Curated annotation (Swiss-Prot):
Belongs to the PsaD family. This is Photosystem I reaction center subunit II. The lineage of its organism: Eukaryota, Rhodophyta, Bangiophyceae, Bangiales, Bangiaceae. It comes from Pyropia yezoensis. The keyword Thylakoid applies. The keyword Membrane applies.
Length: 141
């Protein structure tokens, strides 16, 4: 699936209500999640209730990014679907691609991604805190 969104993509079948969440999102912003379903199956909506995903491409609007991330986690763990993408849709129709930003999910290794707070040795090679107790040196230095 490309990093652009097709707004004519079919939505999952959902018989319930979002509790007014999307009415407020129409004047501010809303989020869209897209994925490719392997078959028609029921899934739990982040807003409550269940919906039936379609076989093939699906597009679902939600009011919060956290709801999209929760649904993405469910798609990944229960349905083994890893091609979901999250977009921010502004009221003027502008669409911004959000997740995964560089095409690789945060928990995966990406050759171009800089490591943050990483130590180049195993935990067994950590310094003993007693050895540096009365020195002006921290255990993480």
């Amino acid at each position: 699936m490309p990093d652009t969104i097709n707004l004519n993509m079919p939505s999952p079948t959902f018989g319930g209500s979002t509790g007014g969440w999307l009415r407020a999102a129409e004047v501010e912003e809303k989020y869209a999640i897209t994925w490719t379903g392997k078959n028609e199956s029921k899934f739990e909506m982040p807003t409550g209730g269940t919906a039936t995903m379609r076989n093939g491409e699906n597009l679902l609007y939600l009011a919060k990014k956290e709801q999209c991330l929760a649904l993405g986690t469910q798609l990944k763990s229960k349905f083994k679907i890893s091609d979901y993408k999250i977009y921010r849709v502004f009221p003027n129709g502008e669409v911004q691609y959000l997740h995964p930003k560089d095409g690789v999910f945060p928990e995966k290794v990406n050759t171009g991604r800089a490591s943050v707070n990483s130590v180049d040795h195993s935990i067994g090679q950590n310094i003993n805190p007693v050895d540096v107790k009365f020195m002006n040196k921290a255990t993480y230095d």
